[in-house]
Amino acid sequence: MFEGAIGHFDCALVTNCQNLRNIIFRGSVSSTGGQGFAHNCPKLDSVIFESTVVYFDLDLLKDSKCPNLTKYIRHGVFLKVYNNKIASIADIDYLKSNPRLIKDLKKTAQWQAQILTAKNSDWMRSNEYQSARILYPVLKALNSKEADTLKAAMNYAWSLGDEVKTKLDILKESPKYNSEPPFDMAFRYAEPSDRMLRMTRKKFNLDKIAGNGDDISRMKNLLYWVHDNIEHDGSNGLAPGARNLENTYESARRNSCGYNCRALAICLTEALLAVGIPARYITCISKGWETDNDCHVICIAWSKSLNKWVWVDPTFAAYVTDENGIMLHPGEVLYRLQHDLPLILDEEANWNNRVKQTADYYLKEYMAKNIYFLETNIWNQAEPEGENNHPQGKTVTLVPVGLTYPHANYNTSDEKWFWQTPL
């Protein structure tokens, strides 16, 4: 039994308790983290929260070795939950009728305010800011004076920089693009008659895979084919040898392994080019690239029927549409994220056919972080990089006004030029 208030707990809090049957939290909890809560507690059948939890971010894992634990029991209040199938949210009317729970929420707010204004609280400040975002409007609705104190602490934490901001917050604050004088160059795309593309097209029978439908149908078929035939393994880098579809595919088969998002994007780009669909792969880079070495690589494909580029991501079998089902390109997705406009992630989006993706995570967290800078090749062809016997292109990065990405050959803030129609 936990008697007092808890600020935050994370990951497996209870492990290897063979005779433990129940856990009770008597006091309030500001936030939880991690999907695993208990591990190897075979007799555990109930976890009860008797007070308030601002953000309940727990799930029930099949491999937790707690076979009898099938739900969490709420006797108090959850203000926000990660999975509403295993825990429900209490409404404000229920809260207003329970002075004890209101008192506990006020104590949580006081603790959050201390964390937000403390020195050297870094990670905890960032975590509790997100929890405070949930609690503040509730306190406001209750006409609690603690709401003003908490808001002041939140404003102070925000003023310190990006520390407490979500990836979407940072993206919304990014400088805008402008229209510069265009480069004296245009993007180039290898024709299907290119020798290497003809070989790829024939070897994999890509015309049959793409099918006889419209251009959207054909690019989706190729997207799913690459996704289903080459697993993603971000830790395994690129396939040894040539950076092309044939070598990556054969290496993955031969070694029973996957490769990183860049490898998959190179493969899909080559497949699209081989059937006559102009395509580029885009390296999506975070604002904090100097310390954040995680980026993500997707593809864009030119749709004649829509007269624009569209987003296709072979790592997650993902594409993105607006509220009318029209496929979008990364620039349109970025704009809609910045302006809170509807974004729909396709229902099939998943990782390695094992983990389903959601718009909240994939777009508003993962890609919101990674579409601050967008880098692409000017010359798009089979084997676009690595050691080979044909000329390599240069890279250009689309950057917000006033910023540069030094690893690109060129930088531009002219988004119209970046998304130009293929010649």
Go through each PLM region and give its residues.
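Structural signature of tandem-repeat unit edges
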Residues: 1-8, 16-31, 42-55, 64-93, ...
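Secondary-structure boundary elements
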Residues: 158-259
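Loop/turn elements at helix/coil->beta-strand transitions in domains of secreted/extracellular proteins
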Residues: 215-220, 273-280, 305-309
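Active-site neighborhood of thiol-dependent amide/isopeptide-bond enzymes
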Residues: 234-298, 302
